[in-house]
Amino acid sequence: MKRTYQPSKIRRKRSLGFRARMATAAGREIIRRRRAKGRKKLAA
């Protein structure tokens, strides 16, 4: 049986990367919340 998680660096960066987050208002909100929380990594 094929597993559900098939890692791909390109797919990860395109959907969850910093530039992808900054492209939408909701994404910018995620970055803002992660900064406020003090996350070392803001995006994938």
Swiss-Prot record:
Record has Ribosomal protein as a keyword: yes
Single GO cellular component term: ribosome
PROSITE patterns: RIBOSOMAL_L34
Gene3D superfamilies per record: 1.10.287.3980
A Pfam family annotated for this UniProt entry: Ribosomal_L34
Single GO molecular function: structural constituent of ribosome
BP GO terms, sorted: translation
Keyword field contains DNA repair: no
Keyword terms of this UniProt record: Ribonucleoprotein, Ribosomal protein
Stored PANTHER family: LARGE RIBOSOMAL SUBUNIT PROTEIN BL34M, MITOCHONDRIAL RIBOSOMAL PROTEIN 34 FAMILY MEMBER
Family the entry assigns: Belongs to the bacterial ribosomal protein bL34 family.
HAMAP family assigned: Ribosomal_bL34
Protein name: Large ribosomal subunit protein bL34
Source species of the chain: Nitratidesulfovibrio vulgaris (strain ATCC 29579 / DSM 644 / CCUG 34227 / NCIMB 8303 / VKM B-1760 / Hildenborough) (Desulfovibrio vulgaris)
